[in-house]
């Protein structure tokens, strides 16, 4: 897997509007990784009083103690900009995420190619089914677990291929030795 030897960040943003000129980022969840090793996590939200949309406010009420809350809607993106400097970003969504993160200099791409999946509305249902994962509000954690599973699967396949190759080599070697000993015994 290409990610095993790279440093990268898996990032999910939840905005107040699908267009960045009409909203702001209400929540950022991100994992900073070196290969498969978790280096750090970034979990920030704006204070509830800054969010006018009650449905959105209710949607992000989970796991309150895990998030750092800020009372300035512009502070979070500045903090993330510093935290993510120099790391490529693997996005969970691209229609609005790139728009909201447009001021960052980081390379950005969707994460799904590393999981041999295509993005779609049901992508997390497919991920949970493919890797036998339990639902979670922390989507970056589901992606991280999926990357680990994918890496393990590729290691298993590589190991099986190596064992198969070694087995074939041993069979060929044994055949040669068997023919040689038959000739010598005549």
Which residues are covered by each model-predicted region?
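N-terminal accessory regions of nucleic-acid-interacting proteins
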Residues: 1-9, 176-179, 183-186
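Conserved non-catalytic scaffold segment of RNase H-like nuclease domains
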Residues: 2-103
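A short alpha->loop->secondary-structure connector
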Residues: 103-114
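Acidic, Mg2+-coordinating catalytic module of metal-dependent nucleases/exonucleases
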Residues: 85-103, 120-168
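Active-site-proximal helix-loop-helix substrate-binding element of RNase H-like nuclease domains
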Residues: 46-60, 64-67, 112-146
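Intrinsically disordered, polybasic Lys/Arg-rich low-complexity tracts
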Residues: 161-184
